[in-house]
């Protein structure tokens, strides 16, 4: 195989039968790949230099951009000393008018009684209400993980060092 560059098709060429939808999709992708409002970005109090968007901002963006969305909990369970949640974020694609989805996962450690160390296999040292506290937090992490797939606006690149800038096709 020789070292010739193969020209990739443009979005317009891929969607030649419906160029208006292709243009709208590019515009949506351009919007979703803008940097988030820096006033919204927070630094995690316990994880060194870890940036994140609070869930209220993520939910605001879902409502504002997609108009219709819903969260489906696919799975909850135990993962070592934590609870885990898998969610599916359903959203109305504003370009196609179809419902689509992204999946996400999240986990949160169970709080244990002071001085007892890690969670014991019989779970005798978990605090009362530990699951009640941890499960919604894990769900929040899962929703935010699913929404990362939308792009930078939802915080996908906040903790990445090497990123590629999105540039919409001109034609």
Predicted regions and their residues:
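Positively charged, aromatic-enriched nucleic acid-contacting surfaces
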Residues: 58-170
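N-terminal, Lys/Arg- and Ser/Thr-rich interaction peptides
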Residues: 1-55
